[in-house]
Amino acid sequence: MDFLFSPYTLPNGVEIKNRLVVAPMTHWGADVHTGVITDAERNFLKGRAEGFGMFILAATLVARGGKSFAGEPHAICETDLPSLKERARIIHAQGAKAVLQIHHGGYTALNDLLDGMDKIAPSDARDMTIPEQAPQGNKAGTRAATEEEIEGLIHAFAHAASLAIEAGFDGVEIHGANGYLLQQFYSGASNRRTDKWGGTREKRMRFPLAVLDAVLEARKESGRNDFIVGYRFSPEEPWDDGLTMEDTLALIDELKKRNLDYLHVSLHDFFAMARRGGKPGVERIRQIHERIDGTVPLIGVGGLVTGEKIEQAATSGWAEFIAVGKAVMANKNLAILLKEGRLDQIRTEIDPNNKEYYGFPAYLWELEGKGLAFLPPLKKGKKN
């Protein structure tokens, strides 16, 4: 485990004390309508950053009409600053760098939380080729964003970054993964435009790159050269016209030209092989790491729920940082267990009889009971 607990200096000169990262975890803990921090969110954050080098907070909304989760935090306007400042303080008090993930859901936005706004995405719902049964299949009522709205969204991401700077965060992570707005613009399945924002790979890439450039400009204007800017992406989509490994590698070629501090690949399985494009029979993350070629550090994540899997990922040589989500949901003291070599004490299940320890908001407990794949399973025979 020596690798995991060695320091790393990012391209902007900021040293991260170790290679362990808490992945962004949706907690449904902020106020449903205002995004203000609540006691439920405070309890969830308490203790989970201990021993980690960096903690990436849950997806945080940059503009009204893009909320994909009830209880999603906000970074929209100055009234959000008190809650943002408190979140940063909570993480800093535990000794980790605090990074805010900035997000817009596009067509995945919840219809009952649009705040009177239209649901917008790259294209009208009827033009998309994403299957209705897809995980992000909630396209009903979506219309194509206008040019003015696109420019407004770019500004919203930059403004959210400025709010994060003012709130005392160490950085932001631009959420370009998991089927949300930035990925929707890059995917040929959801972006059917024929203007400057779509039609070819290069034009589909324009919006996510414009968002990144605007965030980097916000950092420059702030004078905070030590402010971390990262970008999260998903490597493939399973449906026709969706993203392939070739698309992802082309995006990486452009991202690594920018003044980024890290890239973060979102995977369900760290060791999964490429399905569409790229080198057959070669792990996605390995292909991505080779393409980056040392120009920017990579965070790897995906199914690392046991000490053995975390150790295997750490020694693979395919990522400079290792992120965990489900493992730290089940083990608040995960970093300590790893550092002390107590791998056999890492829990992979949630004990519903010990709710106070986990600090989950009520809705998260409700989802736990449904056995959803993105959450640690409940301990068998223990459910009350």
Give, region by region, the residue ranges found by the protein language model.
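Flavin-dependent oxidoreductase catalytic cores
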Residues: 1-384
